[in-house]
Regions:
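Intrinsically disordered, low-complexity
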Residues: 1-98, 163, 183-201
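A broad, low-specificity signal marking well-ordered, structured residues that form hydrophobic/aromatic
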Residues: 155, 166, 194
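Secreted/periplasmic proteins that engage bacterial cell-wall peptidoglycan
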Residues: 43-161, 169-170
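Exported/periplasmic cell-wall-interacting domains
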Residues: 150-153, 160, 179-180, 188-192
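Short solvent-exposed strand/turn elements
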Residues: 165-189
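Generic preference for hydrophobic/aromatic residues in regular secondary structure cores
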Residues: 127, 178, 196-199
Length: 201
């Protein structure tokens, strides 16, 4: 990408070489901070630490068989669901309605999965950041855990692990737009940044 395309006959630019620091040096020859093991220390770390999230699966992970307290998700489309078929919002609305903890339909940009936390709070729902509960909605801000940078994502908490990670059910992750529901383990680091929403009985 650059301003001028690379030409085959152009000389390859000389790249800087750096001495690998030993454990007794706090900086390498380029002046980059290193730790006691010689690893580079990022002076401007990201504020978002997501840990390692699991890969989505279309079947319940075997280690959760017999642990879930909620009924398995069904394939019904519940009344009042005006979200586009197959979207994460469509799936979360149906799942929450199925378990008797519905969250109302939100319009416009308020309906984006990543906005559900703020939208629900404005409507008087109980919303807690970083505090998961089984059967609550889980709203991921844009870009978190691989979600769309603009729309974010919404899932439903199915199980809370002792280590602080959670199992969620979600749609529009596997085979986008198909309506297929999948399962995924979300790390405790990611959980800390998620808005959890209690539906209304």
């Amino acid at each position: 990408y650059g301003e001028a395309p690379y030409k085959a006959n152009s000389p390859i630019p000389k790249l800087p070489t750096y001495k690998i620091p030993n454990k007794n040096e706090s900086k390498n020859t380029a002046g980059v901070d290193v730790d006691e093991d010689g690893c580079v220390v990022n002076p401007n770390p990201s504020g978002e630490v997501t840990g390692k999230n699991g890969a989505p699966t279309q079947t319940l992970p075997p280690e959760y068989i017999g642990k879930l307290t909620l009924p398995m998700p069904d394939d019904k489309n519940y009344a009042g669901n005006s979200y586009p078929f197959g979207q994460c919002t469509w799936g979360a609305y149906n799942r929450l309605a199925q378990i008797g903890m519905p969250i109302e339909w939100f319009s416009g940009d308020s309906a984006n999965g990543g906005n559900w936390g703020e939208s629900a709070k404005a409507k008087g729902y109980k919303v807690e950041k970083g505090k998961p509960h089984i059967g609550w909605g889980a709203s991921f801000h844009g870009g978190l855990a691989g979600s769309d940078p603009t729309a974010g994502h919404i899932a439903v908490v199915e199980y809370v692990n002792p280590d602080g990670s959670i199992l969620v059910s979600e749609t529009n992750v596997v085979k986008a737009g198909s309506g297929l529901r999948s399962w995924r383990v979300i790390s405790k680091e990611t959980v800390a940044q998620v808005n959890f929403i209690q539906g209304r009985k």
